[in-house]
């Protein structure tokens, strides 16, 4: 049998990631802000330009409010307050 070893990772200097401040859920921080499917202006903040719902790790929402946001966006799409496709599809 041959004495081949799996390729090893380089042991060079590691790149340090810049420290990013942890995002805070805007709905937990300000209790007066509510999630409402009838308010498309608020919901558009959580939709990408292609029409996808922005994930929690990017938006900074907590799990509870991310679920509520997702449900509100889907309801708003269902009654045509928000487009199903992104804004680029209208062009």
UniProtKB/Swiss-Prot annotation:
Annotated Gene3D superfamilies: Ribosomal protein S18 (4.10.640.10)
GO terms (BP aspect): translation
UniProt GO cellular component terms: cytosolic small ribosomal subunit
Gene from which the chain derives: rpsR
Record's keyword annotation contains Membrane: no
Keywords carried by this UniProt record: Ribonucleoprotein, Ribosomal protein, RNA-binding, rRNA-binding
GO molecular function: small ribosomal subunit rRNA binding; structural constituent of ribosome
Function, in words: Binds as a heterodimer with protein bS6 to the central domain of the 16S rRNA, where it helps stabilize the platform of the 30S subunit.
Protein name: Small ribosomal subunit protein bS18
Pfam families membership: Ribosomal_S18
Source species: Geotalea daltonii (strain DSM 22248 / JCM 15807 / FRC-32) (Geobacter daltonii)
Subunit structure: Part of the 30S ribosomal subunit. Forms a tight heterodimer with protein bS6.
Biased composition (Basic residues): 12-21
Disordered: annotated segments: 1-21
């Amino acid at each position: 049998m041959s004495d081949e070893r799996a390729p090893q990772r380089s042991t060079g200097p590691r790149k340090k990631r810049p420290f990013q401040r942890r995002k805070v859920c805007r709905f937990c921080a300000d209790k007066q802000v509510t999630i409402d499917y009838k308010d498309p202006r608020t919901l558009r903040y959580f939709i990408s330009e292609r029409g996808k719902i922005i994930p929690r790790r990017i938006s900074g929402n907590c799990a509870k409010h991310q679920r509520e946001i997702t449900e509100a966006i889907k309801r708003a799409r269902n009654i045509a307050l928000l487009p199903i496709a992104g804004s680029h599809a209208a062009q």
